Amino acid sequence: MSINKILSAADITKALGEFKGADSFDHKKFFHMIGLKKKNAKDVEAVFYILDKDKSGFIEEDELKSVLKCFAPEGRDLSEKETKDLLTAGDEDGDGKIGVSEFIQLVANS
C-alpha cells in the first residue's frame, strides 16, 4: 500500500518542509501535521508496515533514521539525536525497536 492512499501528499510535503533543518524533527508535531494523529488504528498500523522496510514486524533504529524518506523521497535522514529521541519515545518495552502496538501508542500520545 502507498502512504499517499492513507495520508495527503500535500500535508506530507508541508510537514517535511517544516523539518528540513538538522535536529528540528518533532514526531508529535510531524504526526499531527501529516494527519496521522487523526487516523484510526487500522490506518496507523498500515503506516507502520510501510515504515517497517525489512518486514521484521518492528521498526529498528536504522529504519527510524530514514523514516522521513518513507513519507516522500525528498525527506531527509534524521540525525543521531533525533533517531534516538524517536526510539526512546516509542520503545515502551526497552527492546531497542518499535513494535506495531508501540507505534500505535506513540501516534496516539502525540
Swiss-Prot record:
Coiled coil: none annotated. GO terms for cellular component: cytoplasm. PROSITE patterns: EF_HAND_1, EF_HAND_2. Keywords: Allergen, Calcium, Metal-binding, Muscle protein, Repeat. Ca(2+) 2 binds at D91, D93, D95, K97, E102. Thermostable between pH 4.0-9.5. Average melting temperature (Tm) across all pH values is 71 degrees Celsius. Lower melting temperature in acidic pH 4.0-5.0. Ca(2+) 1 binds at D52, D54, S56, F58, E60, E63. GO terms for molecular function: calcium ion binding. Pfam families: EF-hand_7. SUPFAM superfamilies: EF-hand. It comes from the Eukaryota. The keyword Repeat applies. InterPro entries: EF-hand-dom_pair, EF_Hand_1_Ca_BS, EF_hand_dom, Parvalbumin. Residues 39-74, 78-110 form the EF-hand domain. In muscle, parvalbumin is thought to be involved in relaxation after contraction. It binds two calcium ions. Belongs to the parvalbumin family. This is Parvalbumin alpha. It comes from Callorhinchus milii (Ghost shark). The lineage of its organism: Eukaryota, Metazoa, Chordata, Craniata, Vertebrata.
